[in-house]
Amino acid sequence: MLVLVIGDFHIPDRAPKLSEKFRQLLIPGKISQIICLGNLTSTSVYEYLKHVCSDLKLVKGAFDISSKAPIAGKITLGSFKIGYTNGHLVVPQDSPEALSILAREMDADILLFGGTHKFAAYELDGCFFVNPGSATGAPNVSAVEDDEKIVPSFVLMDVQGAVLILYVYRIFDGEVRVEKMQYRKPE
């Protein structure tokens, strides 16, 4: 089962559109579920995601003002309990310790979070944390590292029992690069 984890679009206020290179990869019928971590900021992005896959889980981002979406959600895939949130209410934002507390509160084996616009994947305290980054490469206005360029990215998760295979898609110098990672649930 392939699950697309994507977010932080900020279309049209910070980015004009999703890259055509990414659009060519996101083919309807190939993805079983989408988990969107918010900050769509336009209904056209929501409609596009629903076109790619009708099974769309969505949480509200800091800039989704009219969204009725929840701020967090939880699903089970294989043997994993997966929590997901935009991350804008985590204080301090992107703090591994604060995210670890949230994962424990959600009783999650995997915590998906957004908000920083930068891809991240790491294990801490028996939980695996994944931030898919910004799908459009939209700048993060609250980031301290203003000169750091945001790389457009998203991830595909393939859950096989107690193993998560993560495919990280990023655009570098106009070309899509894919990195494969694996996480095994501790016994």
UniProtKB/Swiss-Prot annotation:
Keywords per UniProt: Cytoplasm, Nucleus, Protein transport, Transport
GO biological process, one term: retrograde transport, endosome to Golgi
Keyword Oxidoreductase: no
Domain of life: Eukaryota
One Gene Ontology term, aspect cellular component: nucleus
Pfam families named among the record's database cross-references: Metallophos_2
Assembly with partners or alone: Component of the retromer complex which consists of vps29, vps6, vps35, vps5 and vps17. Component of a retromer subcomplex consisting of vps29, vps26 and vps35.
NCBIfam families cross-referenced by the UniProt entry: yfcE (TIGR00040)
Protein name in the entry: Vacuolar protein sorting-associated protein 29
Organism (species): Schizosaccharomyces pombe (strain 972 / ATCC 24843)
Originating gene: vps29
